[in-house]
Regions:
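Hydrophobic h-region of N-terminal signal peptides that target proteins for export
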Residues: 10-19
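Sec-dependent signal peptide recognition
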Residues: 2-9
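Alpha-helical multi-pass transmembrane bundles of energy-transducing inner-membrane proteins
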Residues: 143-150
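Functional cores that coordinate and move charged inorganic groups
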Residues: 112, 154-155
Length: 179
């Protein structure tokens, strides 16, 4: 019994360190290295043509600054955490977790929805959904659970969110038959 206690005591810090691992961000261009072909599903070009790719840039406008001011913020929209949380990936993480290719200007990018990819980016890891999730890939049971974290009535520019209609414009699945 005492031996079990010491074994648990010895491994407990390792367990907590592993469970609290923060994954690094690699940026859209790194994700796009594999996710740009027709065989893979053209995810990069779908994202590039979406409003998500421009989300951060909208915060650099006078209109965005006016909205931030009306909401009572003393900072420009592009400097306001309440705006950045829905308009940029990686805005609130330690700079050491931002890879060389990561650009906040890329707005709502791959890693906003799919999780920071440094630890699941390799083909070997990506071939296993279980390994990918262990290494930071986020998987949602229902797509809307992710979308409504930003597309909701708390947003100062909220309009009726039509999930099915909007998802049809940006869905970017990996084809089941990649032959």
């Amino acid at each position: 019994m005492l031996l079990r206690f010491f074994i648990i005591l010895f491994f407990l810090p390792t367990f907590f360190a592993y469970s609290q691992t923060q994954h690094g961000y690699i940026g859209t261009s790194a994700c796009g290295m594999c996710h740009k072909t027709e065989k893979q599903g053209n995810q990069l070009s779908i994202w590039q043509g979406s409003k998500h790719s421009q989300a951060y840039l909208t915060l650099q406008t006078e209109k965005a600054d006016q909205i931030a001011k009306e909401k009572g913020f003393q900072t420009k929209a592009v400097e306001t955490p309440e705006c950045l949380k829905c308009h940029a990936s990686g805005y609130n993480v330690d700079a050491s977790l931002l890879g060389e290719k990561f650009k906040i200007e890329d707005g709502v990018q791959c890693e906003t929805c799919h999780g920071a990819g440094a630890d699941y980016k390799s083909k070997k890891v990506m071939e296993s959904r279980e390994e990918s999730v262990k290494n930071g890939l986020k998987v949602y049971e229902k797509t809307e659970d992710l979308c409504i974290s930003c597309h909701n009535a708390e947003s100062p520019t909220y309009v009726d969110f039509k999930l099915e209609e909007y998802w049809a414009k940006i869905k970017h699945m990996v084809p089941e038959n990649k032959n």
